[in-house]
From Swiss-Prot:
The chain crosses the membrane at residues 12-32, 68-88, 101-123, 159-179, 182-202, 219-239. One of its GO terms (cellular component) is endoplasmic reticulum membrane. It is found in: Membrane. Disulfide bonds: none annotated. Keywords: Membrane, Transmembrane, Transmembrane helix. It is a multi-pass membrane protein. Belongs to the TMEM41 family. Its main location: membrane. This is Transmembrane protein 41 homolog. GO terms for biological process: autophagosome assembly.
Length: 246
C-alpha cells in the first residue's frame, strides 16, 4: 500500500522525467551545427509526412559530420513521444529508415519504442490507476479475467498486441500496470512486437522522397508478414493448450 508521502512524490517524479527530456532535447539542439533560417523552421518533430520529408532533408545534409548528434536527437524525441503518448512516432520510424541503414533503424525504433513504453507504463503505475479504471472499466474487467488464466504467457500476448492493431499502443501502455503485467515481459514483448510493423515503415522510409502517404507501406505482402508474426507469437500458447488437453 502506498503512503501519503509516496503518492505526493509521484507528480514530482513525472515533472523530473519531463524536465530530463527537455534538457536532453535542448542539449541536442544546442550541439547541432549552425543552420540557415529556412532550415531551422524544419527542426521540429514531424506531425505529418511532409514534416518528415522536410526534417529528413535537413538532417541528412548534416548527418555525415554530425552523426552522433542526429542519432541522439532522433532517440530522445522518439522516446519522449512514446513516454507521454504523443502522436508522431510513426513519422520518426519512417524518418529513421530514411536516415540510417536498416539494421541501425530497426534496433533504434524497437529500443526507443520499448523504453518509451516502459516510461509510460511507470507513469501510469505511479498515479494513473484510478484514471484507467474510470475511463475503461469494462475493458479492464474483461482483460483482467482473460489474463488471469494466462499469467505465464504475458510475453507472447504482449508481442501479439504490439504486432496487431487490435488495441492502441497508448492504451496498452497505460493499462498494463493496472492489469499487473510485469515490466520485464511488457518491455521485451514491446521490443519484439513492434519489429514487424516497424520493418514495413522503415522500408518505406528508404524512399521517403517518393512517399505520398503512409499507407503505401501496406500491401498484401505486409499483411501476410504481420499475420504470420501474430500467429507465431501465439503459437507457444496454443501448443501449450493442446498439450494440456492431450
Amino acid at each position: 500500500m502506498e503512503t501519503k508521502s509516496s503518492q505526493t512524490s509521484h507528480p514530482w517524479l513525472v515533472l523530473l522525467i519531463f524536465a530530463t527530456f527537455a534538457v536532453s532535447i535542448f542539449a541536442v539542439y544546442s550541439n547541432f551545427p549552425e543552420v540557415s533560417a529556412d532550415e531551422k523552421v524544419h527542426l521540429k518533430y514531424p506531425r505529418n509526412l511532409e514534416d518528415a520529408k522536410q526534417l529528413g532533408r535537413v538532417l541528412s545534409k548534416y548527418k555525415e559530420n554530425n552523426y552522433s548528434v542526429v542519432l541522439c536527437g532522433v532517440i530522445v524525441v522518439y522516446v519522449f513521444l512514446q513516454s507521454f503518448a504523443i502522436p508522431g512516432s510513426i513519422f520518426l520510424t519512417i524518418l529513421s529508415g530514411y536516415l540510417f541503414p536498416f539494421y541501425v533503424a530497426i534496433v533504434l525504433v524497437c529500443s526507443c519504442s520499448a523504453t518509451g513504453a516502459a516510461i509510460c507504463y511507470t507513469i501510469s503505475k505511479l498515479f494513473g490507476r484510478s484514471f484507467v479504471l474510470q475511463k475503461f472499466p469494462e475493458r479492464i474487467a474483461k482483460w483482467q479475467d482473460d489474463l488471469s488464466k494466462h499469467r505465464d504467457d504475458f510475453l507472447n500476448y504482449m508481442i501479439f498486441l504490439r504486432v496487431t492493431p487490435i488495441v492502441p499502443n497508448w492504451l496498452i501502455n497505460i493499462a498494463s500496470p493496472v492489469l499487473d503485467v510485469p515490466l520485464a515481459p511488457f518491455f521485451w514483448g514491446t521490443f519484439l512486437g513492434v519489429a514487424p510493423p516497424s520493418f514495413l515503415y522503415i522500408q518505406a522510409g528508404s524512399t521517403l522522397e517518393q512517399l505520398s502517404h503512409t499507407s503505401v507501406a501496406w500491401s498484401w505482402s505486409s499483411i501476410v508478414l504481420l499475420t504470420g508474426s501474430a500467429i507465431l507469437s501465439l503459437a507457444p500458447i496454443l501448443l501449450k493448450k493442446k498439450l494440456k488437453s492431450d
